[in-house]
Every structure is written in structure tokens, then in C-alpha cells.
């Protein structure tokens, strides 16, 4: 099984005008990775309009609607870091963990991500690391949980 979080899906030092721009960028990376069909980014925006994907600690998890699963070629994560931050319903998001899931894998992502965010040192690394390898290593537990 291919890596759920490919290293080329980790993008650091980005900027976004607003949360909608950040979500569009997330969708574009998933499409660039070949994980989703064209149109998936639009469903990510639809999801965000219906309910915020902000999960706390400066992290959001943009993902598509349930109906968009037909557009997912393979379950994949991408990490986009916005060091300056993006306003997200009054919160400041510095990291987006974009999710393309064929099934209910997003539940495992949430569970594993929650464990990382509960550890202040790990949460800080996720938000501020300038090393893609460090981010990849930090999030390997999520990949393993999804692949099990």
C-alpha cells in the first residue's frame, strides 16, 4: 500500500488569503498527488461551508463531503503549513491536514491527530517545523492507523 502521507504532500511555509484559499490549496495538493479527481476541492469547500473543519491547537482538517468519496482514487493525507496563520471562524490556523478518504478513514485520522495535539511539544512541531521529514515522522502514526 502506498504511503498515505507522501513526503511530496507536505508543503511548508505557505500563505493563504483566507480559509477558503487554504482549503482550495489543500484540494489542489491532493489533486496534484493524484489522490482525487478534479472537483474534489469544490466538495472540500462545500464541507467547510456546512461545518468548520477546525479541530483546535491551530489545526484544521479540510476534507470532502460524504458524496465526494466517488472522486477519491486513494486515501491520502497532505499537510499544508501557513506560518503566519489563517483566520478560521475567529481562530488562527497554521496547519491544515487535508484528507481524501475512500471510506471512514477520517475517523482514524481524527483519533491519531488528537493524540498528537494533546502533546504540547508535538503540536508545536506540527505547527512550526520547517523540516518536511520531521512532519512526516510525526504523522507516521496516522498513516499506520489508516493502513491497519
Q: Which residue ranges define each predicted feature?
A:
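Cytosolic covalent-transfer regions centered on His/Cys nucleophiles
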Residues: 1-148
Amino acid at each position: 500500500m502506498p504511503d498515505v502521507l507522501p513526503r511530496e504532500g507536505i508543503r511548508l511555509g505557505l500563505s493563504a488569503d483566507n480559509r477558503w484559499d487554504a482549503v482550495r490549496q489543500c484540494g489542489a495538493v491532493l489533486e496534484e498527488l493524484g489522490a482525487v479527481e478534479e472537483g474534489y476541492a469544490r466538495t472540500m469547500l462545500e464541507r467547510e461551508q456546512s461545518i468548520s473543519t477546525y479541530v483546535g491547537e491551530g489545526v484544521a482538517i479540510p476534507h470532502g463531503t460524504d458524496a465526494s468519496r466517488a472522486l477519491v482514487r486513494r486515501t491520502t493525507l497532505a499537510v499544508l503549513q501557513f506560518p503566519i496563520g489563517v483566520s478560521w471562524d475567529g481562530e488562527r490556523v497554521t496547519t491544515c491536514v487535508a484528507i481524501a478518504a475512500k471510506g471512514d478513514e477520517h475517523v482514524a485520522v481524527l483519533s491519531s491527530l488528537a493524540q498528537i495535539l494533546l502533546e504540547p511539544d508535538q503540536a508545536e512541531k506540527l505547527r512550526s517545523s520547517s523540516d518536511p521529514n520531521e512532519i512526516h515522522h510525526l504523522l507516521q502514526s496516522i498513516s499506520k492507523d489508516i493502513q491497519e
